[in-house]
Amino acid sequence: MKKQRNLRSMAAQAVEQVVEQGQSLSNILPPLQQKVSDKDKALLQELCFGVLRTLSQLDWLINKLMARPMTGKQRTVHYLIMVGLYQLLYTRIPPHAALAETVEGAIAIKRPQLKGLINGVLRQFQRRQEELLAEFNTRDARYLHPSWLLKRLQKAYPEQWQSIAEANNQRPPMWLRINRTHHSRDSWLALLDEAGMKGFPHADYPDAVRLETPAPVHALPGFEDGWVTVQDASAQGCMTWLAPQNGEHILDLCAAPGGKTTHILEVAPEAQVVAVDIDEQRLSRVYDNLKRLGMKATVKQGDGRYPSQWCGEQQFDRILLDAPCSATGVIRRHPDIKWLRRDRDIPELAQLQSEILDAIWPHLKSGGTLVYATCSVLPEENSLQIKAFLQRTADAELCETGTPEQPGKQNQPGAEEGDGFFYAKLIKK
């Protein structure tokens, strides 16, 4: 039996680590969830994700409710109050329970002397809620994005930026990829129906299914046997453009955690696939995914800027470059991205992408296909990146995705319920 812990204080400390220390919630949350009971795991996740999704609103409210910000060793209390406000605003937790548990969180973070302060701030919000929210809804903070990102979205998409920001603030659906080597999509949907769940096929991507209601993976028919993988529909779109064939030598560059590596092998089981990533730790997930699906690929640790170090002079029939990027297209899945990224990161990422493209291009065979993909919505990483590459690379030709003036295909967050994603298909003359 797991020791009863105060979830509100755990959520506050997790959010503090993201915002103040720049840590990823994906790294922080799983170990915390191991410390709580199964029934509390979902609530802990909801509190962490929810506070990060609405952080700018909660911050604005605290500044209105408190004369002075909490600093130094008391900073965790600031985030604990955020957790309390989030519950009052966005959850069905009865207000008295939300207040009581949040106030008790002060003991867990060793600040019992501040219980009265926390209680007072939250009760003041309850009294002034209508007035405060009316004022908040006139401010830029209502878009729940940092100002630098809003400015970039406004510049790139003068007509769409508000809908993009709104889509980023929604909860994402759960998309699955059916392993066509085991089941047709229709036959797996029948199994899902027998298990008491409902799914909907994607109109364009032949392996994609959206669950009506997200479910734990162990409840999915055949998950442990490799019949199905969790992967957003937009990420599955990479295979439409890559179109891998049996017998080909295919490189999946920046491959971790391996979702696209295994998709290549589902589409072309007899392809010779090399999966490369710079992060040795994340490569363990590539091995895990290959093992669960019963597949084989050559997995290597390597830097995409220096391919000769890990593949010599080898050339490939097809290359999938899922480039390192700002991840501004998947904010709805990872709301911490809004607070981890900085404006200065964008030119640095664009430079890295450019270096990888230039370095890997000589390793594509003549007549071969390279698909450049990101989960970003920013032109500097996408259309402008490919436009510049085409201008400096005489033997590169854009194929099927956009025009030389506006290269690539940009999926916006929420379009057909998928993530924000960019694809450009290039052919080597």
From Swiss-Prot:
EC number annotated for this UniProt entry: 2.1.1.176
A single MF term (Gene Ontology): rRNA (cytosine-C5-)-methyltransferase activity
GO CC terms, sorted: cytosol
Residues the record lists as binding S-adenosyl-L-methionine: C254, A255, A256, P257, G258, G259, K260, D277, D303, D322
Active site: C375
SUPFAM superfamilies: NusB-like, S-adenosyl-L-methionine-dependent methyltransferases
UniProt keyword terms in alphabetical order: Cytoplasm, Methyltransferase, RNA-binding, rRNA processing, S-adenosyl-L-methionine, Transferase
Pfam families in the record: Methyltr_RsmB-F, NusB, RsmF-B_ferredox
Disulfide bonds: none
Location (main, coarse): cytoplasm
Residues in the signal sequence: none
Enzyme class at the top of the EC tree: transferase
The UniProt record lists the keyword rRNA processing: yes
Subcellular location: Cytoplasm
Similarity field: Belongs to the class I-like SAM-binding methyltransferase superfamily. RsmB/NOP family.
Descriptive protein name: Ribosomal RNA small subunit methyltransferase B
Organism: Shigella flexneri serotype 5b (strain 8401)
The organism's taxonomic lineage, starting at the top: Bacteria, Pseudomonadati, Pseudomonadota, Gammaproteobacteria, Enterobacterales
Gene: rsmB
